[in-house]
């Protein structure tokens, strides 16, 4: 509704951090510019998922907090208890000041402490039943969103809104999806569920006080049955359904159903009982979904040091959900610096449910302000052997050290695995001892990033979290090293299933899934080099397949238009010239 002062636009970005950046920096700048041109002030609000706000019912009436958390003087409490006390005091101050008790504004705390003052979506009593419904922070955030012309949210909440019939966001007239290259992954995450023995046991114990018959014990037993089934299964995808695992899932489903029935009929003010019932209902819904073995879902067994073995379930595709629930009724703009893969929008369009031919969308490629061909070099180490799954090769390590030496540090190393990053850090520390080599895992990432920025001659090595979002302009980063093309792991159950589905439908599963995934990450990683008009440097890809494989041209077309070479001496000479010019400029 062009020009309508009541029209509402929703902007959804990938992460909470980017949401905060938009709300605190970019949106106010845009609003000020709009006011200057039109004379109108555009109202705006931020909307996040429920668990990002304090729950006053948990703060004021909640049970189950550690006793030490109830100590009046935080100095007398320790660890978790002190954090909870601080959060509760802050929340009460937020309520008094008409704030929103947004987690981003909270005092320093651990996830465990935040869990004591917030509530999962399914366990929320709802504004009508909750004694604090009229002063609920979530309800207030929604009221502010409904009163605003511009609402800033995230991909996950957009997905929840689509899955639940438009209940999470206010009605809107247009939607802008920022960082749209991450949309499929974020929506997939929001639509995925997991089921583990510890999770089932925890919920069963919450239900026990109100279950007088055997149903409570059967719920506990179901957790043991699930553990046994997972222990017998192989880690990975179970496309046909492992009999022992499926039997265990059905056991959990049936026990959860009995618990839900047994907990029914409680009074509205029996908060803990109602929340226990909601938790049991969630376990039932997850187990029921998994037990169906629907063709639209992918189910697999995972194992981690923290959670042990778990059963995971994710949608095979989110294209239909996006096409029917997001794109069908609104004008939608998808924006990102890396939407063109292989030189066009077809791959991204297909992944979000649009016609790859362009019949139902218009693609606009806005030229970059950067002259990539003059500002950067793409060096592909064609002389190296193709990377293997056995770890980074000695020749590749030597290549990294030589490039880092030529760049005088100032290197961002992007690696396919933590093991490769650590191996490269050890090697370079030994071979180039006069340079500081920081490695992900040595400290918290924000601290490492700050150290990288503060010391212009330092280098930072890491994995996926460094590929996207790291913004280090200037001489701090003259060299970006990518050890291998970032294809998904061959044993990734979800990617494996999606690739197989495309192939069975007559398409090229590898190009549609694996190459698209790699192209997106390569574009993001290479994009770390040039951040301003004055930046210069080299992107070094130590994977010869970028120029020797048939899919190499597709991946190269996904990258910024750097001048390309396969000659190591050319890359090293360019890096040394940058060092010389930097010193000359400093002396001048």
What are these regions (language model features)?
Residues 3-149, 239, 254-265, 495:
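A substrate-engagement module of RecA-like helicase motors
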Residues 8-17, 333-335, 409-416, 540-542:
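Conserved RecA-like ASCE P-loop NTPase motor core of nucleic-acid helicases/translocases
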Residues 17-20, 24-29, 121-150, 154-253, ...:
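Signature of the SF2 helicase/ATPase Hel1-core->accessory helical subdomain module
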Residues 115-149, 164-166, 258-382, 391-398, ...:
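A contiguous, basic/glycine-rich beta-loop/short-helix subdomain that forms a polymer-engagement track
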Residues 197-277, 374-405, 411:
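Conserved interdomain linker/interface between the two RecA-like ATPase lobes of SF2 helicase motors
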Residues 369, 381-391, 442-547:
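Conserved RecA-like P-loop NTPase helicase motor core
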Residues 416-441:
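Conserved helicase motor "Helicase C" RecA-like lobe of SF1/SF2 P-loop NTPases
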Residues 540-588:
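N-terminal targeting/trafficking signals and adjacent low-complexity tails
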């Amino acid at each position: 509704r062009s020009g309508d002062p009541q029209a509402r636009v929703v902007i959804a970005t990938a992460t909470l951090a980017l949401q905060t950046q938009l709300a605190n920096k970019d949106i106010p700048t845009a609003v000020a510019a709009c006011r200057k041109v039109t004379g109108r002030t555009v109202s705006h609000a931020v909307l996040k998922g429920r668990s990002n706000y304090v729950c006053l019912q948990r703060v004021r009436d909640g049970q189950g907090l550690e006793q030490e958390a109830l100590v009046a003087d935080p100095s007398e409490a320790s660890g978790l208890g002190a954090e909870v006390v601080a959060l509760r005091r802050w929340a009460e101050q937020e309520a008094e000041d008409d704030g929103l008790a947004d987690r981003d504004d909270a005092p320093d705390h651990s996830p465990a402490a935040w869990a004591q003052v917030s509530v999962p979506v399914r366990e929320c009593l709802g504004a009508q039943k909750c004694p604090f419904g009229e002063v609920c922070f979530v309800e207030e955030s929604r009221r502010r969103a409904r009163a605003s012309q511009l609402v800033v949210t995230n991909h996950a909440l957009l997905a929840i809104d689509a899955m639940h019939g438009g209940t999470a966001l206010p009605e809107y007239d247009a939607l802008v999806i920022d960082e749209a290259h991450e949309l499929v992954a974020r929506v997939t995450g929001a639509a995925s569920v997991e089921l583990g023995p510890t999770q089932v046991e925890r919920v069963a114990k919450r239900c026990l006080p109100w279950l007088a018959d055997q149903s409570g014990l059967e719920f506990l037993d179901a957790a043991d049955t699930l553990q046994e089934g997972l222990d017998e299964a192989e880690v990975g995808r179970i496309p046909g359904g492992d009999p022992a695992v499926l039997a265990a899932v059905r056991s959990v489903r049936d026990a959860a159903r009995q618990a839900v029935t047994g907990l029914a009929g409680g009074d509205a003010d029996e908060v803990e009982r109602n929340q226990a019932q909601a938790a049991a209902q969630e376990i039932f819904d997850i187990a029921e979904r998994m037990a169906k073995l629907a063709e639209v879902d992918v189910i697999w067994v995972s194992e981690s040091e923290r959670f042990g073995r778990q059963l995971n379930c994710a949608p095979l595709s989110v294209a239909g959900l996006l096409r029917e629930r997001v794109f069908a009724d609104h004008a939608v703009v998808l924006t990102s610096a890396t939407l063109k893969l292989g030189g066009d929008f077809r791959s991204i369009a297909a992944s979000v449910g649009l016609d790859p031919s362009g019949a139902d969308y218009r693609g606009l490629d806005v030229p970059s302000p950067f002259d990539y061909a003059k500002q950067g070099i793409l060096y592909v180490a064609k002389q190296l052997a193709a990377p293997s799954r056995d770890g980074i090769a000695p020749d590749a390590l030597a290549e990294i050290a030589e490039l880092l030496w030529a760049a005088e540090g100032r290197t961002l190393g992007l690696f396919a695995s933590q093991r490769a990053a650590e191996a490269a850090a050890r090697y370079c520390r030994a071979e180039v001892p006069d340079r500081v080599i920081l490695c992900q895992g040595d400290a918290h990432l924000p601290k490492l990033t700050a150290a990288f920025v503060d010391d212009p001659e330092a280098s930072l090595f890491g994995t996926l979290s460094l590929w996207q979002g790291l913004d280090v302009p200037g001489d701090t980063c003259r060299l970006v090293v990518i050890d291998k093309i970032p294809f998904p792991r061959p044993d990734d159950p979800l990617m494996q299933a999606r690739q197989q589905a495309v192939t069975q439908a007559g398409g090229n599963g590898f190009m549609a899934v694996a190459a698209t995934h790699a192209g997106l990450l390569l574009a993001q990683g290479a994009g770390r080099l040039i951040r301003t008009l004055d930046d210069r440097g080299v992107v070094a890809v130590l994977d010869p397949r970028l120029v020797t494989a048939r899919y190499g041209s597709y991946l190269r077309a996904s990258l910024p238009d750097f001048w390309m070479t396969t000659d190591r001496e050319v890359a090293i000479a360019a890096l040394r010239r940058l060092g010389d010019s930097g010193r000359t400029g400093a002396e001048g």
